[in-house]
Amino acid sequence: MDATFWAFIALVIFVVIVVYMKVPGMIGRTLDERADRIKKELEEARTLREEAQQLLAEYHRKRKEAEKEAGDIVASAEREAKALLEEAKRATEEYVARRNKLAEQKIATAETDAINAVRASAVDLAVAAAGSILAEKVDAKAAGNLFNDALAQVKSHLN
């Protein structure tokens, strides 16, 4: 019996002890448990990935909605600003038109007042000139006749 035989016997005894101790079953169970744990982790990872994709899709949808809403808000603000600008322009034009009309009325009033003042001055000047001419050229008898004629005209107009 040589050393190879004893090595073979030791190997057989070792294998019998390993089988008797149910080491292959323990190894199999351990590997099965590990495989189950890995499957479970893979399934959990797949579930998490699907949830992440759903969340990503939802965030993309919400972002698009937010962008659309922001665009609508900007468009609405632009419309309101344009309307306010047009209203301000219209109000300014009305104000300018009223001010121009008021200025034209004041100018017309000033012209009328100036014309009346010139006429009044002309009448006063004419009366003064006529008075001075009459004073130079009319004697007492002619003045009495003129006074009587004027008095008669006033009486005829009053009756």
From Swiss-Prot:
<dbReference type="InterPro" id="IPR002146">
    <property type="entry name" value="ATP_synth_b/b'su_bac/chlpt"/>
</dbReference>
<dbReference type="GO" id="GO:0005886">
    <property type="term" value="C:plasma membrane"/>
</dbReference>
<dbReference type="InterPro" id="IPR050059">
    <property type="entry name" value="ATP_synthase_B_chain"/>
</dbReference>
<dbReference type="GO" id="GO:0046933">
    <property type="term" value="F:proton-transporting ATP synthase activity, rotational mechanism"/>
</dbReference>
<feature type="transmembrane region" description="Helical">
    <location>
        <begin position="1"/>
        <end position="21"/>
    </location>
</feature>
<keyword id="KW-0812">Transmembrane</keyword>
<comment type="function">
    <text>Component of the F(0) channel, it forms part of the peripheral stalk, linking F(1) to F(0).</text>
</comment>
<keyword id="KW-0375">Hydrogen ion transport</keyword>
<comment type="subunit">
    <text>F-type ATPases have 2 components, F(1) - the catalytic core - and F(0) - the membrane proton channel. F(1) has five subunits: alpha(3), beta(3), gamma(1), delta(1), epsilon(1). F(0) has three main subunits: a(1), b(2) and c(10-14). The alpha and beta chains form an alternating ring which encloses part of the gamma chain. F(1) is attached to F(0) by a central stalk formed by the gamma and epsilon chains, while a peripheral stalk is formed by the delta and b chains.</text>
</comment>
<keyword id="KW-0997">Cell inner membrane</keyword>
<comment type="function">
    <text>F(1)F(0) ATP synthase produces ATP from ADP in the presence of a proton or sodium gradient. F-type ATPases consist of two structural domains, F(1) containing the extramembraneous catalytic core and F(0) containing the membrane proton channel, linked together by a central stalk and a peripheral stalk. During catalysis, ATP synthesis in the catalytic domain of F(1) is coupled via a rotary mechanism of the central stalk subunits to proton translocation.</text>
</comment>
<keyword id="KW-0472">Membrane</keyword>
<dbReference type="GO" id="GO:0045259">
    <property type="term" value="C:proton-transporting ATP synthase complex"/>
</dbReference>
<protein>
    <recommendedName>
        <fullName>ATP synthase subunit b 2</fullName>
    </recommendedName>
</protein>
<keyword id="KW-1003">Cell membrane</keyword>
<keyword id="KW-0138">CF(0)</keyword>
<keyword id="KW-0066">ATP synthesis</keyword>
<dbReference type="Pfam" id="PF00430">
    <property type="entry name" value="ATP-synt_B"/>
</dbReference>
<dbReference type="GO" id="GO:0046961">
    <property type="term" value="F:proton-transporting ATPase activity, rotational mechanism"/>
</dbReference>
<comment type="similarity">
    <text>Belongs to the ATPase B chain family.</text>
</comment>
<keyword id="KW-0813">Transport</keyword>
<keyword id="KW-0406">Ion transport</keyword>
<keyword id="KW-1133">Transmembrane helix</keyword>
